[in-house]
């Protein structure tokens, strides 16, 4: 994914917003790096959030609609979408690497396989436990329910 913005530019933008008193809300998309980048995406995202320390953080899970440019990468095999278990693995890696005390965390969008809610860092253990239980039981939202 080429976002057209560097990590440093994200951090500077967050600092400028904070300087004006605007609350910072950030959205991350799980699965954006595909299977090859799962660990790197999770850890780099956690590092960015640790640096930015947003007021709010939302986690979505990648959904590709017909016609999406990334769909060609999936069809050609250059990118493999994450399985539900891998999405939870990525979220687990993120939560074990992030340090953003007080950030309101939500992963309750229709695209997500499970819903999580809490405040970082206080509620990370409970969210990790919910992820582990969901993985053990294969308790994921049905694909057909992941659409709005």
Residue ranges and their predicted role:
Residues 1-21, 31-52, 72-85:
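Conserved non-cysteine loop/helix-boundary elements of the Radical SAM core domain that shape
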Residues 47-148:
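Auxiliary Fe-S-binding modules of radical SAM enzymes
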Residues 28-31, 61:
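Short glycine/proline-centered loop/turn elements that form peptide/ligand docking sites
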